[in-house]
């Protein structure tokens, strides 16, 4: 592969590619929305780690974070935005292409 022909690896979204954020994005891609505790359990991330990665995804406008009260307790809901859904779809396409381009 020449320097001019990097293929799909050059197009991999580094924000999504980080393992913790990849888990968050994958979970949210499948469900309409999820609460913070559900994502903690599904990803195995600590409160602080999930919160940190959630902030980065929110800054990129890949997720929407809604805070509400449920039985007088704070409740955080996360949802993929259309931009996030499109970015994840493109990420999957690029990763698939990387593997297809590998020799047998």
Located regions from the model:
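Surface-exposed beta-strand edges and their flanking turn/coil or helix-capping segments
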Residues: 37-39, 51, 77-78, 91-95, ...
